[in-house]
């Protein structure tokens, strides 16, 4: 690829082929390859016309980009609480914070578990709202037979280094079934070029006038696209292994009385980006809490974490703004104080997963009253 000197979107073919393959894989009509997952959210909001005076509802249990993209669009992030099992926003928590200024919803499918999308889409239709699916942690997840990223108006994907699949450290994608929206996003990511002017219009000899609006350069490189195409072929095997690893940890955790293991609905395929279980604090011995459990697990050589930021609005970036909710979001805070997160990536060996399970049970036996 490098020796060919065809290394950007306009000199090579890999980017365009990756877009076609990813659209087919995600069950959508269109896909656009981008430089990272954050600009996937940016281009979605811009194309939907979200801006000054608008409010966008989003979860607080997420990475900052889900909220900062709203701020950068000139809109106001409004944080909704989450479901205790999926850790995702729901139609009920969304409706609780809706106002006449609400323009859109960003649904983050946290850790590979999809939001309950039917009620959310029904609510959005009733109130003429746009829905962006943040699929950064959910490659391969599905809801009632539909791949995530194919249900809302736009799916925004990340291929960052630690995601389920990567394009060499950074990368992103947007997916949609709306052709007009696809053309608008395609134009925005490439200096305002018009798809019709580039591909579907006859031009007189001489200079070709292609830029019919204003945009910027958010294109993916050909090297990124080549890596993405290869990784996409490995997704079925990787997803099977990820889920098997998560199920082993869930089974071990299920034998610990002081742990709560959420049950994934039968109509949902979990992408198993990470594996979460939750501490029942009322069943712990005195002197034990989630953080001590994490420390004891780590001391025995097993990586374990508290998980995703539970109240992203507590970041310093929100100081001096009106974006923080008047009261802490109760469920999000509870999850943030009780969650245990484990790695389940497909390169982990059976011995490593077995050790994770054994250490988890050993530590919980010490911690449980």
List each model region and its residues.
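PLP-dependent aminotransferase class I/II
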Residues: 13-20, 28-29, 92, 104-108, ...
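PLP-dependent aminotransferase-like
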Residues: 46-135, 142
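Structural detector of well-ordered beta-strand residues that form the stable sheet scaffold
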Residues: 32, 57, 78, 131-132, ...
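Conserved active-site segment immediately N-terminal to the catalytic lysine
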Residues: 133-168, 183, 207-212
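Hydrophobic/aromatic ligand-binding patch that stacks against planar heteroaromatic rings
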Residues: 68-70, 123, 147, 164, ...
């Amino acid at each position: 690829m490098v020796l060919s000197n065809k290394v950007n979107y306009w000199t090579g073919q890999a980017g365009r082929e990756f877009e076609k393959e990813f659209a087919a894989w995600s069950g959508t009509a269109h896909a656009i390859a981008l430089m990272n997952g954050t600009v996937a959210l940016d281009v979605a909001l811009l194309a939907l016309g979200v801006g000054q005076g608008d409010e966008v509802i989003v979860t607080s249990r997420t990475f900052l980009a889900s909220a900062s993209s709203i701020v950068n669009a000139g809109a106001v992030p409004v944080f909704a609480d989450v479901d205790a099992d999926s850790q995702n926003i729901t139609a009920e928590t969304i409706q609780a914070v809706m106002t006449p200024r609400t323009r859109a919803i960003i649904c983050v499918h946290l850790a590979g578990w999809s939001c309950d999308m039917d009620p959310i889409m029904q609510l959005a239709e009733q109130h003429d709202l746009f829905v962006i699916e943040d699929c950064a942690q959910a490659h391969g997840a599905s809801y009632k037979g539909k791949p995530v990223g194919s249900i809302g108006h736009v799916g925004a994907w990340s291929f960052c280094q630690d995601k389920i699949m990567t394009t060499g450290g950074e990368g992103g994608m947007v997916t949609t079934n709306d052709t007009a929206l696809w053309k608008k996003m395609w134009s925005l990511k490439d200096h305002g070029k018009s798809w019709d002017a580039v591909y579907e219009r006859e031009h007189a000899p001489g200079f070709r006038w292609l830029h019919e609006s204003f945009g910027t350069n958010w294109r993916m490189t050909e090297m990124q696209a080549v890596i993405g195409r290869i990784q996409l072929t490995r997704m079925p095997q990787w997803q099977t292994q990820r889920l098997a690893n998560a199920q082993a940890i869930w089974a071990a955790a299920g034998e610990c009385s002081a742990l709560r293991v959420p049950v994934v609905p039968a109509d949902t395929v979990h992408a198993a980006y990470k594996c979460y279980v939750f501490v029942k604090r009322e069943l712990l011995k005195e002197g034990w809490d989630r953080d001590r459990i994490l420390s004891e697990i780590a001391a025995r050589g097993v990586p374990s974490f508290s998980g995703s930021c539970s109240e992203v609005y507590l970041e310093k970036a929100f100081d001096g703004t009106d974006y923080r909710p008047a009261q802490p979001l109760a469920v999000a805070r509870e999850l943030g104080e009780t969650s245990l997160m484990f790695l389940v990536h497909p390169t982990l060996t059976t011995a490593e997963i077995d050790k994770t399970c054994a250490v988890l049970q050993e530590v919980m036996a010490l911690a449980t009253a």
